[in-house]
């Protein structure tokens, strides 16, 4: 039997999974690593620790001595790394997608009326979230970086490119269309790096990787006496779209990981949002480029980690389930989880997190429930924005670590007033990487074949009388007040 390898490089951990041809998990390993918070709004990663987490999870998979015929890489998007073209040595820590240090730069470009130009070409808004302003910051703030870049001696990559570079021994500098589409430098209409965007952000073209389809031949890597072709690379949220088999226009998924990302397949042409959502590339498989609309929420699992590590409300994330109210009642307590600003559809980089409505009677359960509801309320805002853009939502497929919490899934269904579909394996990004690589290698004949294969799903249906419209209205008023305070 042939086997597929998925390298799933996430914001706080790396996971490697071996699948058989029917996409059953054969073996997996996971390794966490720390993020670095040098200043308010700054989030970094040590490139060496990130790379070490990949090898620590990859080597046990290779040690199985199975016939792994291809590998796929999926990765946290937008996180920005710059390294020496000859030695591979990073010039500084990686700047993580959550980092907001370039807010002033983005605001200055908005003042020059450049946001509409950027949005028309990239489908993205002007926000520190995306890679371009992060590259500019590195070139302008790391000593000697700009001169080295202009001399052709530096390379930029999102995490996929960085991993491919190192796995290939520094011989391959490529990315795929999904990761390129998150940089604010890639024109999603022409499928090329855009000269005007490079000029706006002052980034030399020589730094950038070659852009390929998601199921391209990305070369191979040799490790532990094995040579494995890499036939798939795809950003993690797009990989979850593939993993959930969202191959038809209108298919939609939401991934609840470090952040939360709702994505709907919008077909073969880009659809511009009028409601604060992003137009992006969903995937390019078997030649066809499928586009997507996306709503990005910056904090999801991060909220639970903060309640655990900083507030010490519980010892492990699973214990948060015990403190989550079954009915979603938080006794007037509200929470805005803007640790690094707020994402779609509001896009405010300055606002910060806050609780509201705390009294002497407020309990840990009230605060934990308010925190979970703050995520659900953001999902409702994105659902409403999608409907304003003409997307008719009948149900929602979900995945990611948080959806193993049955109480959360039930409340999500109650408040969204939708059926929630949870797959048996909630790690859709890893499955998507395996599917992408399998298509690239020729193991799967068609996307529809994969979609029609039976999958076990758990379905949560909304209960009557749980959603509190007044509580949602108060939460929205509180968010608007905070955005005014931090204006």
Which positions does each model-derived feature cover?
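Active-site nucleophile and cofactor-binding loops and adjacent substrate-binding regions
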Residues: 23, 45, 70-75, 95-98, ...
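Gly/Ser/Thr-rich active-site cleft segment
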Residues: 9-11, 118-237, 300, 304, ...
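A polyampholytic, Gly/Pro-enriched intrinsically disordered region
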Residues: 111-127, 228-233, 251-253, 439-453
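Gly-rich Lys/Arg/Thr-decorated short loops/hinges at beta-loop-alpha junctions or inter-strand turns
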Residues: 34-44, 117-118, 174-181, 359-366
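N-terminal phosphate-binding loop and adjacent alpha-helix
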Residues: 29-67
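Glycine/Thr-rich phosphate-binding loops that ligate phosphate moieties of nucleotide
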Residues: 1-30, 37, 69-112, 146, ...
């Amino acid at each position: 039997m042939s086997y597929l390898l998925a390298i799933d490089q996430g914001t706080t951990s790396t996971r490697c999974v071996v699948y058989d041809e029917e996409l059953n998990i054969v073996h997996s390993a996971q390794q966490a690593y720390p993020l670095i918070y040098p200043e308010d709004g700054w989030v970094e990663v040590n490139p060496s620790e990130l790379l070490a987490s990949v090898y620590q999870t990859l080597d046990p998979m290779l040690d199985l001595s199975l016939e792994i015929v291809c590998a796929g890489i999926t990765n946290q998007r937008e996180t920005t790394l710059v390294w020496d073209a000859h030695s591979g040595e990073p010039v500084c820590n990686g700047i993580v997608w959550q980092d907001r240090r370039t807010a002033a730069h983005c605001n200055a470009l908005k003042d020059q009326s450049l946001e509409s130009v950027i949005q028309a070409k990239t489908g993205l808004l002007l926000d520190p979230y995306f890679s371009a302003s992060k590259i500019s910051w590195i070139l302008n703030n790391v000593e000697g970086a700009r001169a080295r870049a202009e001399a052709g001696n530096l390379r930029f990559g999102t995490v996929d490119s960085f991993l491919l570079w190192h796995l290939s021994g520094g011989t391959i500098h490529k990315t795929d269309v999904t990761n390129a589409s998150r940089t604010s430098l890639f024109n999603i209409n022409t499928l090329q790096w855009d000269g005007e965007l490079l000029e706006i952000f002052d980034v030399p073209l020589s730094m950038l990787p070659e852009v390929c389809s998601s199921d391209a031949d990305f070369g191979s890597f040799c490790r532990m006496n094995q040579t494995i072709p890499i036939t798939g690379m795809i950003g993690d949220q797009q990989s979850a779209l593939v993993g959930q088999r969202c191959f038809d226009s209108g298919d939609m998924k939401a991934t609840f990981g470090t952040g939360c990302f709702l994505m709907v397949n919008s077909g073969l042409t880009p659809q511009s949002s009028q409601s604060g959502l992003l137009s992006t590339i969903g995937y390019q498989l078997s030649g066809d480029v499928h586009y997507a609309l996306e709503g990005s929420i910056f904090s999801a699992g991060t909220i639970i980690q903060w309640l655990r590590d900083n507030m010490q409300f519980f010892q492990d994330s699973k214990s948060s389930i015990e403190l989550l109210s079954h009915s979603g009642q938080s006794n007037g307590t509200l929470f805005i989880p803007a640790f690094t600003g707020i994402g779609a559809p509001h896009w405010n980089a300055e606002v910060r997190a806050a609780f509201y409505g705390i009294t002497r009677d407020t309990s840990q359960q009230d605060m934990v429930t308010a925190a979970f509801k703050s995520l659900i309320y953001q999902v409702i805002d994105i659902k409403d924005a999608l409907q304003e853009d003409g997307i008719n939502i009948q149900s929602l497929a979900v995945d990611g670590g948080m959806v193993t919490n049955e109480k959360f899934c039930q409340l999500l269904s109650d408040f969204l007033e939708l059926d929630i579909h949870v797959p048996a394996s909630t790690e859709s990004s890893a499955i998507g990487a395996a599917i992408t690589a399998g298509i690239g290698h020729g193991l799967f004949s068609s996307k529809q074949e994969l979609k029609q294969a039976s999958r076990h799903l758990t379905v949560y249906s909304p209960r009557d009388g749980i959603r509190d419209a007044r509580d949602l209205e108060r939460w929205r008023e509180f968010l608007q007040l905070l955005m005014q305070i931090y204006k």
